[in-house]
Amino acid sequence: MTTAIRQAEGEEALDHFQVGSYSPYLFFSSEEWARFRADTPLTLTLDEVHRLRSIDDPIDLAEVRRIYLALSRLLSSHVESSQLLFEQRNRFLSTNVTKTPFIIGIAGSVAVGKSTTARVLKELLARWPSSPKVDLVTTDGFLYSNATLVRDNKLNRKGFPESYDTAALLRFLSAIKAGQQNVKAPRYSHLTYDVLPDQHTIIDRPDILIFEGINVLQSRDLPRDGKIVPMVSDFFDFSIYIDAEESLIHNWYVKRFMKLRQTAFRDPNSYFHRYATISEDEASTIAENLWSHINLINLRDNIQPTRPRADLILRKGENHLVEQVALRKL
């Protein structure tokens, strides 16, 4: 097929989340998508890409050229359109208010590569000719503390929707979209596997905010008491879902867990230090159990169902590189 726009064939590769010609998405192979880069310059070096990627993520300059430069160009057009609409509205209302940040949400399973995508995009976007101020915040800091989760008997549900302080998360995004200065984002330590008490990152009116987390496209049940509660995605100007087959994510998760045993888990201060001292077979069994009893359930019940809410879906293949892109029609 020579055309870049794919309908039925694309839906087959993306698990039939829409049917026939009524799909709200346009589908592209990675090679077709790469052509949309046009003349977008490569502004990252190989060393920078290696620094930005997560453990066991093979992204390289070729993948940046193939996928992320076109994505950067697309996002640039959305940001420019948002700015134009803002200026037109100012003229319409005869006001001179300051534009609020453009927020990009990035969702997907654990071990699928969300953090790498977020960090690479942050650097690419910050190097646009307009030199926008770009900040990155993850939802990890909005998890309840381990002490709270233990108290509520929810530690084994960490990462599930109920383990997040949704009210605090919504207050944060509301403040960002209201254009407030010096908004505090709580910090999280992957070493101690816990939020850091009284530690925050200050977000001061960026031009663009990238908000990354497994549950950022989560929907809510309609309220029964008549109170209207916004969803996290209500604050997004653009959203991205990182996708892959369950079996691939499973393999990546276990492989990453085993590699962390040889690196981060060896730190005596690591919450998972005990896994660095057991046998490889024992560690593999634990990783499999964590996947099947926690992460797979969360993926099926809470994360994957949010995929059709994304504006753009990056579908990865066996080598952890993007094979297909789905872009929502306007």
UniProtKB/Swiss-Prot annotation:
| UniProt-listed PANTHER family | URIDINE KINASE (PTHR10285)
For this protein, the Enzyme Commission number is 2.7.1.33
Q: Which NCBIfam families match?
A: panK_bact
InterPro entries, per database record: P-loop_NTPase (IPR027417), PanK (IPR004566), PRK/URK (IPR006083)
Catalysed reaction equations from the record: (R)-pantothenate + ATP = (R)-4'-phosphopantothenate + ADP + H(+)
- Gene encoding this polypeptide? coaA
Q: Which HAMAP family match?
A: Pantothen_kinase_1
Where does this chain mainly localize? cytoplasm
What is the name of this protein? Pantothenate kinase
Where is the protein localized?
A: Cytoplasm
Which GO biological process categories is it annotated with? coenzyme A biosynthetic process
For the keyword Transferase, the answer is yes
Q: What class of enzyme is it?
A: transferase
